[in-house]
Amino acid sequence: MKRALISVSDKNGIVPFAEKLVELGVEIISTGGTKAAFEQAGVPVTGIEEVTEFPEMLDGRVKTLHPAIHGGLLARRDTAEHMEAIAAHDIKPIDLVVVNLYPFQETIQKSGVTLEEAIENIDIGGPSMLRSAAKNYAAVTVVVDTADYDTVLTELEEHGATTFETRQRLAAKVFRHTAAYDALIAEYLTNITGETFPEKVTLTYNRKQVLRYGENPHQDAAFYTEPGTVENSISSAKQLHGKELSYNNIRDADAALKIASEFTEPVAVAVKHMNPCGVGVGENIEEAYLKAYEADETSIFGGIVALNKEVDAKTAEHMSKIFLEIIIAPSFSEEAFAILAKKKNIRLLTVPFAGSVKGFEKTSVNGGLLIQASDSVIEDTASYEVVTEKQPTEAEMKALIAQWKIVKHVKSNAIVVGSDKQTLGIGAGQMNRIGSALIALKQAGEKAKGAVLASDAFFPMDDTVEAAAKAGITAIIQPGGSIKDKESIEMANKYGISMVLTHVRHFKH
């Protein structure tokens, strides 16, 4: 290895790396700020303009886009015609490229960033050099990640060159990196133009964690996250205590957070297998947790609990009495953390909360991807329609709205029975609506008397209304829209219960 081209925005570790290269007899070529850093540190360096014999121009937009650079990168060392061609133009081969790109992601995440600032942080020369070097990895070593500095130096010291396997691995990393970089730029500009579903979608995610296994032990898995901070998201969670999250932990935590984000008042949400088993609302977080626990004392065992307010010592004392896999909250008081951290296996996570989840959801199918807007429609309760002779009381309406927020997060067919403070029975995932209703009503038992019922979609028959009325339900909320709505309304009138139509369906598959 004789010549290296180094141009980095992240200068961590670059000076000692370059110093070692010089010790190994490698000539360093560099640009702009990187060259200045080397000169300040006393590292011998050749300016890019000395190689290209052309000055930087257009405020630095053009400096490495030159045949003297790309010819030196792309020339095949095993092809005589290539080597003769670059020699005829006095172009020398470049054996190592170390480049990381302008911080586009960090720039667009800054508050108040302008389009001009974003555009100026789109790197052109860097990706071009990386791609040229990576294409010719048979002869050229290319580094885009500071974590690979040591590997390159070790191989150079031991063998005088990098191995083919290392060059191939680094080239693959480069193409992943530049593809992700371009995808982020494309997404940013697409969002500005307002296109919702462009003809091509390229997504970029960063690996956060290799998981022990997936949904089952025989399935390999990893957790990838979107670039940047996504509020209300398990991807942005900070783990304070406990062992690593599992695949199922992550999915359940995501489900719990989505429900907790629906409420502004203190709420506690217990989830098992991506369905809520208990949701409690209170004047404070202790009351909310106790309501969630009382909703289903059996199913909460081994569950995930998400709370939208800080966990205090009193709440922590209650929670420490049973086995919970995960507790997620915006924060934990010092006393609460000390209480819960005594249990070594419990996972304690903090997540920034900021209202209900918005944006788009992505679901993979065999050979494709479904993208839809999140089910975060803002519903105007003033547009809800009371269709029965009996009007819901103020207390019933409060309870209906609370359960309506919850039922949309339950797997369809979904029925939730509850009050304004807690769920009392949850029927999820049955192939017919009456099946889910009977499960929810059975779970609620005697507590169904005076409670309300929420359904994520319309009633195809009047049987659910009749079952609810016989169990003591006093009010029902549902979207409406069935050709048999009239029969359901008549059944509600027969038993003297109120029914509210929202005209918004909340299927969840």
Swiss-Prot record:
GO terms for biological process: 'de novo' IMP biosynthetic process. Coiled coil: none annotated. Pathway: Purine metabolism; IMP biosynthesis via de novo pathway; 5-formamido-1-(5-phospho-D-ribosyl)imidazole-4-carboxamide from 5-amino-1-(5-phospho-D-ribosyl)imidazole-4-carboxamide (10-formyl THF route): step 1/1; Purine metabolism; IMP biosynthesis via de novo pathway; IMP from 5-formamido-1-(5-phospho-D-ribosyl)imidazole-4-carboxamide: step 1/1. InterPro entries: AICAR_Tfase_dup_dom_sf, Cytidine_deaminase-like, MGS-like_dom, MGS-like_dom_sf, PurH-like. Its EC number is 2.1.2.3, 3.5.4.10. The keyword Hydrolase applies. SUPFAM superfamilies: Cytidine deaminase-like, Methylglyoxal synthase-like. One of its GO terms (cellular component) is cytosol. It holds the Pfam family MGS. The keyword Hydrolase applies. Residues 1-144 form the MGS-like domain. It comes from the Bacteria. Keywords: Hydrolase, Multifunctional enzyme, Purine biosynthesis, Transferase. It catalyses: (6R)-10-formyltetrahydrofolate + 5-amino-1-(5-phospho-beta-D-ribosyl)imidazole-4-carboxamide = 5-formamido-1-(5-phospho-D-ribosyl)imidazole-4-carboxamide + (6S)-5,6,7,8-tetrahydrofolate; IMP + H2O = 5-formamido-1-(5-phospho-D-ribosyl)imidazole-4-carboxamide. GO terms for molecular function: IMP cyclohydrolase activity; phosphoribosylaminoimidazolecarboxamide formyltransferase activity. NCBIfam families: PRK00881.1, purH. Belongs to the PurH family. The IMP cyclohydrolase activity resides in the N-terminal region. PANTHER family: BIFUNCTIONAL PURINE BIOSYNTHESIS PROTEIN ATIC, BIFUNCTIONAL PURINE BIOSYNTHESIS PROTEIN PURH. This is Bifunctional purine biosynthesis protein PurH. It comes from Listeria monocytogenes serotype 4b (strain F2365). The gene is purH.
